[in-house]
């Protein structure tokens, strides 16, 4: 409906100069097939149609490839769905509120944007870990749907080229985590099943790093690999 409203507004503006009048507002049709059936007319032929990917599919893509534009869009959709404005402020407020509803101590979370690019964002490793815990074992089973989007070490998404050396190969195929990459900040938050079959959640964050320094990402990957190999039973 938002797209239809925008189209109608632009049509009114363009038509004014040509002496055309376009009625204000947009009405939702019951559907061409239903309308045709009610009037006894032949059903129209569909010339073309486009269907959006589902929200779940978009969330999977966002997590897999770390799509910042999609993250911002999801944030605004969440804002509208919770009665807030579809603005940046509405989106960040919605994310913080939903994190709190999931059991995360969200009172100290500071968000300047949703995708995580802004340097003013402040989220602790504990808050990321609690978010993953809510997704994996929390009472709201709806959150489980996003777990498939977590990249898998050495196999998919932003982790597809990692976990290939001797120090991290033990985590390949086992570590599932969302990456975070800025010039001086790196993060890896996710979950892994260890050698004893226990589900472990984790979040590693490196701040004040030398941009592009060798070993930064490998350090996070080695830490997650150690968790994958844990076992004392």
Predicted features along the sequence, with ranges:
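C-terminal soluble interaction/assembly domains
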Residues: 94, 104-233
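A small/polar active-site loop signature that marks catalytic segments
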Residues: 1-144
């Amino acid at each position: 409906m938002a797209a239809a409203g925008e189209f109608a507004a632009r049509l009114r503006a363009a038509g004014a100069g040509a002496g055309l009048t376009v009625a204000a507002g947009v009405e939702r049709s019951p559907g061409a097939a239903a309308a045709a059936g009610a009037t006894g007319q032949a059903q129209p032929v569909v010339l073309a149609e486009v269907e959006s990917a589902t929200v779940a599919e978009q969330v999977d893509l966002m997590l897999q490839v770390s799509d910042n534009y999609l993250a911002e869009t999801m944030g605004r959709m969440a804002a509208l769905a919770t009665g807030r404005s579809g603005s940046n402020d509405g989106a960040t407020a919605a994310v913080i509120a939903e994190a709190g509803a999931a059991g995360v101590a969200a009172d100290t979370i500071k968000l300047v944007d949703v995708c995580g690019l802004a340097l003013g964002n402040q989220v602790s490793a504990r808050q990321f870990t609690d978010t993953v815990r809510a997704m994996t074992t929390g009472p709201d089973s709806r959150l489980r749907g996003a777990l498939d989007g977590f990249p898998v070490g050495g196999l998919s998404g932003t982790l597809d080229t990692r976990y290939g050396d001797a120090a991290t190969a033990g985590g390949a195929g086992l570590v599932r985590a969302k990456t975070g990459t800025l010039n001086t900040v790196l993060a890896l938050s996710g979950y892994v099943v260890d050698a004893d079959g226990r589900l472990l959640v984790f979040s590693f964050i490196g701040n004040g790093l030398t941009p592009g320094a060798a070993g930064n990402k490998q350090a996070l990957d080695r830490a997650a690999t150690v968790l994958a190999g844990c076992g004392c039973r």
